[in-house]
A protein has these predicted regions:
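Short, hydrophobic-biased segments on the C-terminal half of alpha helices
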Residues: 46-47
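N-terminal helix-turn-helix DNA-binding core of bacterial DNA-binding proteins
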Residues: 3-5, 9-37
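Alpha-helical residues within the helix-turn-helix
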Residues: 33, 50-51
Length: 133
């Protein structure tokens, strides 16, 4: 499991919106400058977050983006699954994966199952509020 730039940037954007949350919409340009992320890249990430209703956005004068919930209500796992897809460490544990023909004899499967469980459990336990500290 390697978290892509999209996943890392999505977390940075969510933290930025949380840290500057006064109820107003924050212009994308300001977020991009503070986070040193290109506007072009943000234009690909923000719609994903909006469509999942993690943030809301308004176009035009006075527009921008803001959180839809309190920072402590956003679990990191949800954001990363949205931007990364399945977080399984190996293909045979991905959601909807066909059963591997070696499952019955695979000596490493218990390792991957436990790693997957621990990673997901940890990411479920961390919120945006935790990352603001």
């Amino acid at each position: 499991m390697l978290i892509s730039s999209r996943g890392r940037y999505a977390l940075r954007v969510m933290i930025d919106l949380a840290e500057h949350n006064d109820g107003a919409y924050l212009p994308m340009k300001e977020v991009a400058q503070r986070q040193d992320i290109s506007l072009k890249y943000l234009e690909r990430i923000l719609p994903i977050l909006v469509s999942a209703k993690l943030i809301e956005g308004i176009h035009g004068k006075g527009g921008g983006y803001r959180l839809t919930k309190k920072p402590e209500e956003y679990r990191i796992r949800d954001i990363l699954r949205l931007t990364e897809g399945d977080l399984a460490p190996v293909a045979c544990l991905e959601c909807g994966a066909d059963a591997c023909h070696r499952t019955a004899e695979c000596r490493t499967l218990p390792l991957w199952v436990e790693l997957n469980r621990r990673v997901n459990e940890y990411l479920d336990s961390v919120t945006i509020a935790d990352l603001m500290r």
